[in-house]
């Protein structure tokens, strides 16, 4: 079993909230259980232990109508391989989020996660994406990579840590920045906006949450932050990490 855990933050390298704790602990637990679990995340400007990273290679990543540089670094901590995606324009800043171009930054990161698989000796059975920052990974996988032999058997899990943050932007971002043509924009559009998380709901093979309580909470209109209609429409039944076993999950995908 091979799992690539895509996250915008992970301990011990970068943290702004609980996502980093899960991204730092779950892959480690899976490795102890015999799973080849690896983590991929941005190489932020204030990333801890930057001096210990090993340079691997660099390549170009499509971002809308243009291409952007991506450097690949790696490190191993507690038996887990971490990959770091470098682009100084997007990530060499103080802090992780809250910038005017966050949509472009994480559209780049989501596309770069998939492009990276061409340059490493690792093809995951599952890509586990987390929150809106990686929500375009399953969208891009289905639109642009699924026909390739390396990608056609990869399954995706999307984990909701905080449904309040969905990656909502004007629809003009979709073609120019995200590279999603008009024919496919309905996948990511919701309620007059581009909504990255909605795109993951439409394209991921399985949806999980971080606890049984939260899995039930987000089915309530009061706690769904506008996504309750979509959840009802898709008869959405999220499962929690408490109930998630990697081997069982792959068997049912």
PLM features: residue spans?
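N-terminal subdomain of nucleotide-sugar transferases
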Residues: 1-74, 206, 211, 215-216
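Short secondary-structure boundary/capping segments
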Residues: 19-22, 47, 53-57, 100, ...
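Conserved nucleotide-sugar donor-binding subdomain of glycosyltransferases
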Residues: 77-132, 176-199
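Acceptor-binding helix/loop patch of EC 2.4 sugar-transfer enzymes
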Residues: 90-101, 150-194, 212-219, 225, ...
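An aromatic- and histidine-rich active-site surface loop
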Residues: 102, 108-109, 127-146, 154-174, ...
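Segments forming glycine/polar-rich beta-alpha architectures that bind adenosine-containing cofactors
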Residues: 229-234
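Conserved small/polar residues in nucleotide/adenosyl-binding loops
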Residues: 242-252
